[in-house]
Amino acid sequence: MSLPSSRAARVPGPSGSLCALLALLLLLTPPGPLASAGPVSAVLTELRCTCLRVTLRVNPKTIGKLQVFPAGPQCSKVEVVASLKNGKQVCLDPEAPFLKKVIQKILDSGNKKN
């Protein structure tokens, strides 16, 4: 049994004017957070852990700056990144006894200045 072509079922869907209105609204909507997020590469690097492997020991005299990144949704572990005076960056084990001593020395020297 076949239906005549004039009586074929019509598939319900949005009308042409509704589609045009939605397209116009989409074009007029500012991108919002995407515009202020910065380069795509910066966004992508924040979605994973920074440290893939850690260095067990570094001479404390070669450390120029220490950065501590707390655990969060992007990485489940605390990460410590040391910027060395020669320009290299290395990841350190936050549980290493030598690192705890280095951090304590930094905190103590900061307290002496105050």
Curated annotation (Swiss-Prot):
Pfam family, one: IL8
Top-level taxonomic group: Eukaryota
UniProt record, GO biological process: antibacterial innate immune response; antimicrobial humoral immune response mediated by antimicrobial peptide; cell-cell signaling; cellular response to lipopolysaccharide; chemokine-mediated signaling pathway; chemotaxis; inflammatory response; leukocyte homeostasis
Chief place of localization: secreted
SS bond list: 49-75, 51-91
Protein's cellular compartments: Secreted
Gene Ontology CC terms: extracellular region; extracellular space
Membrane-crossing residue ranges in chain numbering: none
Key words of the record: Antibiotic, Antimicrobial, Chemotaxis, Cytokine, Disulfide bond, Heparin-binding, Secreted, Signal
InterPro entries per record: Chemokine_b/g/d (IPR039809), Chemokine_CXC (IPR001089), Chemokine_CXC_CS (IPR018048), Chemokine_IL8-like_dom (IPR001811), CXC_Chemokine_domain (IPR033899), Interleukin_8-like_sf (IPR036048)
GO molecular function, one term: chemokine activity
Signal peptide per UniProt: 1-37
Family label: Belongs to the intercrine alpha (chemokine CxC) family.
Chain's role: Chemotactic for neutrophil granulocytes. Signals through binding and activation of its receptors (CXCR1 and CXCR2). In addition to its chemotactic and angiogenic properties, it has strong antibacterial activity against Gram-positive and Gram-negative bacteria (90-fold-higher when compared to CXCL5 and CXCL7).
Name the record gives this protein: C-X-C motif chemokine 6
Source organism: Homo sapiens (Human)
Source species taxonomy: Eukaryota, Metazoa, Chordata, Craniata, Vertebrata
